[in-house]
């Protein structure tokens, strides 16, 4: 039963805890006095609203900080105004009504790509020049690639395709260039007949 109330601390739905609030406030004040003596920041708003026994509130205040980030008063000193902390605790209560602690979803972090947009004009001009140079280089490379592909096609036409039937080769290749050995006039096939080889 105690764990259930610890998970739902600070919610207005906690019923039957009004009797314990007086002891919580006393325990919260004792905790603040201890933190002032040690020189640590006091936890103001949340301990008054929590609604648990005073001893548990003190143990929780001295232990690990809450992961859900509900204690806004952690970073403040005792000397700051109390109405401000009460206003924050009221806004926290409204936020707790909207979404329970179990459904807590962290906010999205800022994307790192947005940081690079604030460059100086000098850097942006240099980047533009680099991009322009790189685009020219890409155009040259593209032209080189097309030339290389054309040369490859010519070589393939000259050398002959060994996997294409001979009748189809005749239409593609000029008359004197048909043989693999480069014999003038063709001189027959350059390789042994593959049709005569027995299948394994």
Curated annotation (Swiss-Prot):
GO cellular component, one term: nucleus
Family according to the record: Belongs to the TFS-II family. TFA subfamily.
Main localization of the protein described in the UniProt heading: nucleus
Highest taxon listed in the record's lineage: Eukaryota
Compartment(s) where it occurs, according to its Swiss-Prot or TrEMBL record: Nucleus
Matches recorded under Pfam families: BEX
Region annotation (Disordered) ranges: 1-200
Function: May be involved in transcriptional regulation.
Basic and acidic residues bias (residue ranges): 1-49, 61-85, 94-106, 114-153, 190-200
Entry keywords, A to Z: Nucleus, Transcription, Transcription regulation
Positions of transmembrane segments: none
InterPro entries registered for this protein in UniProt: TF_A-like/BEX (IPR021156)
Record's protein name: Transcription elongation factor A protein-like 5
